[in-house]
């Protein structure tokens, strides 16, 4: 079993639907991320989105209890070189403040938890080690204070 890795993205509240309690987010742009000792690449075209519907949306990747579940990914798709997701947020009282912060634009960043099935290693023109995911899948998304994929944003027009 491969190790669950984490990568971040951000979202804007413009697609928040209060009636449905949903928000649309770009959860990955495939941007390079500097890791310890290498550059990580998650090409969007190599992502397997089968089975992502129903994946949990967590509080900062915390998996220590069901109270950490803030919502669920209803669907995800590739478009314009991005992975986008429709997230259904919980209506539980204990997460109402978090949902309000999402709607108000206070909480904007998302991070994905993913597994890489196959890596390819190479060296950049600058001599840096590069690890490219040839096959990878998303297993959860989390709201986080700071994200690594700075180019990922929520779409203003769904």
Predicted ranges, named:
Residues 61-76:
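A surface-exposed loop-and-adjacent beta-strand signature within N-terminal beta-sandwich domains
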Residues 8-17, 22-25, 56, 74-158:
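Residue microenvironments linked to proteolytic maturation
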Residues 1-53:
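Polar/acidic, low-complexity leader/linker segments enriched in S/T/G and N/D
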Residues 30, 36-39, 46, 55, ...:
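Generic secondary-structure boundary/loop-capping signal
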Residues 53-64, 110:
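Short conserved beta-strand and strand-loop elements enriched in small hydrophobics
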Residues 37-39, 64-66, 123-129:
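Acidic Ser/Thr/Pro-rich low-complexity disordered segments
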Residues 31-32, 63-65, 91-93, 118:
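Short, charged/polar surface micro-motifs in flexible loops or helix N-caps
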